[in-house]
Structure formats: C-alpha cells, structure tokens
C-alpha cells in the first residue's frame, strides 16, 4: 500500500444544503438530487446504484449494492429473487436501509423504512422490459445457493434457453419487486473541514418533519 489509510482523505467544497433550499417533504428533494446525479456522475458510477442493508432472523446485518428501479410517492423499488438471501432476510425482518452515494456531487442519501412486495402485475411489467438474457437468468440462477462451479451455472442457463426456445419467458413466481416505504430520509452534503450539512426527514403521524443533524 503506497499511502497510509490514515492519510487518505479529501475535503468537500462543492456545495451546501440550507433549509431554505429544501422542500417540506423529501421526495421532491430526492428527485432533484437524483436528476443532478444522472447528469453529473460518470461511468463507472451508476446514479441509481445504492447499498441495501437487511437484517436476518438472528439479528445479523447484511448489505450489498443494487440498482433502484422504481420511485413514486409510495417509496423506492428494487427487484430480486424472492428465494435469495436478501429475500429470506426481508421475510424474517421486513425493514431495510438504503444508501445512495454520488461522489462527483459530494452527496449521500440514507433511507430507512418497512419493505413490502410489489404486486405481481408490477413485477411482471418490469420483468417484460428486461433484456432476454436477464429474463432467462431469473429462471436459471438459484440465487445465493452454493453451486459446484461456473460450468453448473452455464448448464442451467442452457437448459433454461432450451425450455423457452419456442416461447418468451414469463415472470417466475420466485422473482419480483420490493418497495421500501420510507420512514426516515437523510440528505448529506459534504462540506469543508468535515462540517457537513445533514437534513433529516422523519415521518411522524403521516407528516414529514424536517430537522438538521450535527455532522
């Protein structure tokens, strides 16, 4: 390692986040920040990439990077195999947290809340617009299970291709979407000397309460 971890740092000086710049509810601000990220972030950063944290039935946390695939007034939607590790964890504990980090903008958004499955119709609608290889993969891959090697996975894919050689694959019952219904959304804007701006929204009795947090 050419540089000590203790010496690795950068100062954030791009922008600030004041209360008079923030709306009374968080979705409008997220839409604004997300649009900024889409325009600003460059490959390999994906603006809709986020870390999803879940907790299993034994209280152990797990996290991974996923892509946000839906956003509306209800919440934030992603898709996965319901039999996967994350699916099992959400079945045991239906709460999760998301984090978006947009380094070019020096911004981060943290979201926490309850997670519920979307309707089968919503899952099918998204499934049908995926590339064919991804649709076949949803059938072929026993996600999160131990396999003997890459050859086994490729064999499963070939078998799935043969199965659907004369027809288009439909959305499997074990695959679909989850929607995180936010109860807390924090917007973080990096500032100089680690004196960052943090605006936190909490859902209280159906209304969003906005407050500033110390960095």
Curated annotation (Swiss-Prot):
Please list the reactions this protein catalyses: pyridoxamine 5'-phosphate + O2 + H2O = pyridoxal 5'-phosphate + H2O2 + NH4(+); pyridoxine 5'-phosphate + O2 = pyridoxal 5'-phosphate + H2O2
Residues binding substrate are 9-12, 69, 126, 130, 134, 194-196
Please, which domain of life does this record's source organism belong to? Bacteria
Residues involved in FMN binding: 64-69, 79-80, 86, 108, 143-144, 188, 198
Its top-level enzyme class, in one word, is oxidoreductase
Q: Which cofactor does it need?
A: FMN
Q: Which InterPro entries match?
A: Pyridox_Oxase, Pyridox_Oxase_CS, Pyridox_Oxase_N, Pyridoxamine_oxidase_dimer_C, Split_barrel_FMN-bd
Q: Which HAMAP family match?
A: PdxH (MF_01629)
| NCBIfam families (UniProt xref) | pdxH, PRK05679.1
Can you tell me which family this protein belongs to? Belongs to the pyridoxamine 5'-phosphate oxidase family.
Known role: Catalyzes the oxidation of either pyridoxine 5'-phosphate (PNP) or pyridoxamine 5'-phosphate (PMP) into pyridoxal 5'-phosphate (PLP).
- Name of this protein: Pyridoxine/pyridoxamine 5'-phosphate oxidase
Organism expressing this protein natively = Pseudomonas putida (strain ATCC 47054 / DSM 6125 / CFBP 8728 / NCIMB 11950 / KT2440)
- Species lineage, top-down? Bacteria, Pseudomonadati, Pseudomonadota, Gammaproteobacteria, Pseudomonadales
């Amino acid at each position: 390692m050419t540089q000590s971890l203790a010496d690795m740092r950068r100062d954030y000086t791009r922008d600030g986040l004041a209360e008079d710049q923030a709306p009374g509810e968080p979705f409008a601000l997220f839409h604004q920040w997300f649009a900024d990220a889409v325009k600003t972030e460059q490959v390999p950063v994906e603006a809709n990439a986020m870390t999803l944290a879940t907790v299993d039935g034994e209280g152990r946390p797990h996290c991974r990077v996923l892509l946000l695939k839906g956003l509306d007034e209800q919440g934030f939607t992603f898709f996965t195999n319901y039999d996967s590790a994350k699916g099992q964890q959400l079945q045991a504990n239906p709460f999760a947290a998301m984090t978006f980090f947009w380094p070019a903008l020096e911004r981060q958004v943290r979201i926490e809340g309850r997670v519920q499955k979307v309707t089968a119709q919503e899952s099918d609608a998204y499934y049908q617009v995926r590339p064919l290889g991804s649709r076949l993969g949803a059938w072929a891959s026993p996600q999160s299970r131990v396999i003997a090697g890459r050859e086994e996975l490729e064999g499963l894919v070939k078998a799935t291709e043969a199965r659907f050689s004369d027809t288009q694959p439909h959305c499997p019952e074990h695959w679909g979407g989850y929607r995180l219904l936010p109860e807390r959304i924090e917007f973080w804007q990096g500032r100089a000397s680690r004196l960052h701006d943090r605006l936190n929204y909490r859902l209280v009795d159906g209304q969003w309460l906005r407050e500033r947090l110390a960095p």
